[in-house]
Amino acid sequence: MAAVESVQCFGRKKTAVAVTYCRRGRGLIRLTVPIELVEPEILRYKAFEPVLLLGRSKFAGVDMRIRVKGGGNTSQIYAIRQSIAKALVAYFQKYVDEQSKKEIKDVLLRYDRTLLVADPRRCEPKKFGGRGARSRFQKSYR
């Protein structure tokens, strides 16, 4: 039995994690969350930025299945776009050729670095003596 050509990559934004399972296929991209239900509409385009940047021809021979968990709507969209981009680069590196992988990577990095590199910023924890991480309760002298 022949081995299935597949790669699995993840994208993260804050607490949202998207896992993309990428294998040879007909160009289908399936999400656990129906993309038509995402509001506002600009976020829908944001999720498929890698597809719009590289064109459908790069995705023609690849099927992608995406699971996303955690975070809010915007964080999930950013995690999805990162996992799609990383999965395509990994697939081209492993099963196609190094030259086309480098072209894809250069296009994505030139457009937006966060398509391939995760954003390390996290929410700062609350401390005592105030309502939040940095704000303090008002001080009274009398």
Swiss-Prot record:
It is found in: Cytoplasm. Keywords: Cytoplasm, Ribonucleoprotein, Ribosomal protein. Gene3D superfamilies: 3.30.230.10. Signal peptide: none annotated. GO terms for biological process: maturation of SSU-rRNA from tricistronic rRNA transcript (SSU-rRNA, 5.8S rRNA, LSU-rRNA); translation. GO terms for cellular component: cytosolic small ribosomal subunit. The keyword Lipid metabolism does not apply. GO terms for molecular function: RNA binding; structural constituent of ribosome. Its main location: cytoplasm. InterPro entries: Ribosomal_Su5_D2-typ_SF (IPR020568), Ribosomal_uS9 (IPR000754), Ribosomal_uS9_CS (IPR020574), Ribsml_uS5_D2-typ_fold_subgr (IPR014721). Belongs to the universal ribosomal protein uS9 family. This is Small ribosomal subunit protein uS9.
